[in-house]
Amino acid sequence: MDKIEELAQLRENLVDDIEARHINRLNIALENLEKDVVKLANTLPLRENKLFEARLAVELRPKIKALIDKHYVLWADGTVREYDKVAKIIVDNMKILPISENFKTLTELDIETITNLKRVKFTGFLDIATETTNALADEIYQSTISGKPFEDTVKTLQHRINGVYIKADQDEINDLVELVATTTDETVKQKAIDKLHTVYGADRVGNNMRRYAKQLAHDSLMEFDGQFTKAKAAEAGLTNFLYYGDIIGDSRPFCIANRGKIFSEDELRDKWSSESWKGKSTTDPFTSRGGYNCRHHLQPTDPSWYNENGDLII
């Protein structure tokens, strides 16, 4: 592993560690949100085990929003603030490269770029908060109008937040949920997920806050990493990039074909625009690399730093 690869690996290690913490805290936040939303729903009066007071159902909307702000939006705020750690390692990596000292510090322009990127990412998390607030409030109101059994309403609310990973009464189900959230053994995880799906078959695929927030937590972090790396590289006049990262079972053909290769910006953009593959995003290679949920990184480099054999000489 040469110096450029080492710098890319350091970034990858940090980003992976930050993402793991973000997802762990998200799981906790949504578990607490689910618990509080159920508790709030239980404050509504029932008649024959059904909600019946439409006015009270409507009045619950701001209370639901307050709970989402308390648990989820607070999590999102802390998540986006931690992007500063990614920005720091990107700047620290630049200090190792043979470039002008002018580009080895955090400039006022960098701070403005970081602030704007964080604002955009936070807005994405807020969109999920708004969508979930509306979905939960609408479910309570519609259940009141239709006379839906209250226990079914509660279950729908839980699933809208956490999908199949709702807090269940059965100890076995809760143990499976905990196992999926914590195990690093993919075989064990898949068996647990399959068992959960057997119990909650209708929710195998569905819209829920956990699913979208988890995906956005990954994509936003990786997008920030890629976008700020590109900005710092452009600032320093670096227009070549090493496509870096591991290959795993579901790696896309684009990533498998390009991993370990060095491309100019134009070459990379040409490849991106001329090729199609499953999971390709609508952004660009510096934002998404191989597409949605991609874990690869682009590390700035320069052809003059290598000899005719392709060995790094800096």
Question: Which ranges hold each PLM region?
Answer:
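N-terminal leader/targeting and assembly helices and adjacent pre-domain segments
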Residues: M1-D203, T301-I314
